[in-house]
Amino acid sequence: MIINIEPGTFGTVRNGDLIGVANVLEHIRKTNNDPSIQFHLKPGNISSDVHCQTFYEIMLKMTNYFSKEEGTETLPWRKVNVWDFRDISGDLVKIPNNAPMEKKITIFPLFDAPYNTYRNWPTNLLPHLVEKFSADEYKDYEKIICKKGEPTEGCPFDGWRYSTNFVQNYYHITTAEIFVGGDTGSSHFAFALDRGPKDLLYYNSSRGLVHTLPFYLMQGHGRMTSYWLDFENTRWQ
């Protein structure tokens, strides 16, 4: 069965939200004892941003959650917050992954969040992580910083390289042994993989939202570290 999703059902869906929508679908499948149910997202559901449309194509290829074919039924819900819905459903979404794991470290820094800007990392966090994973115990690992940017942009960190291709960056997640990310879609993807990185590290502000924590983190899947953002302009003297 294919269920049509009208615009406005889940708001404007971005990358992490799309995984949240899949989690809602898993709840509907479980409730109806039917693992074949799919969603057809009508135009206007997904953000028009190119990277959001591209991520939808990735999810179409990797999962059976979504159908490009229109269904015969329509979900009557409106204004459902997919993150709050987790209080009803729990964490159910699983993204199949059969890519071979490699000795690879991927860091997905977050510096340009356009909303909920507390998600943006302090500037010293990335150099700290680079130093941590440049230790001798990681000498045999490929080290990649996945980010937006030009393909020719040089990486200033010795032994590391930049990857700026959006699709390739998501492939790196599927093959990495170690993943580091913030409160954004790449982390939700990494944590939702049925065979993801062995070491999942999530960095977020201690003032961040609980309901957008990566899937399964609260059950002990992966680790979270919080950083301090000085909202009050603290003075020490």
Short names for language-model regions:
Residues 58-104:
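A nucleotide-sugar donor-handling region in carbohydrate enzymes
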Residues 1-75, 168-171, 178-181, 186-192:
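Active-site and donor-binding regions of nucleotide-sugar-utilizing enzymes
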Residues 4-22, 123-220:
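Donor-binding and catalytic core of enzymes assembling or modifying cell-surface/extracellular glycoconjugates
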Residues 100-116:
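Conserved donor-binding/catalytic core segment of Leloir-type glycosyltransferases
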Residues 2, 36-40, 106, 142-144, ...:
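A structural signal for isolated positions on well-ordered beta-strands in alpha/beta enzyme cores
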Residues 67-71, 160-163, 219-236:
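Short acidic-hydrophobic, aromatic-tinged amphipathic segments that line or gate anion-handling sites
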Residues 116-124:
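Glycine- and acidic-residue-enriched helix-capping/strand-helix junction motifs
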Residues 42-43, 109-110, 146-149:
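Short, well-ordered beta-to-alpha junction loops that form the rim of enzyme active sites
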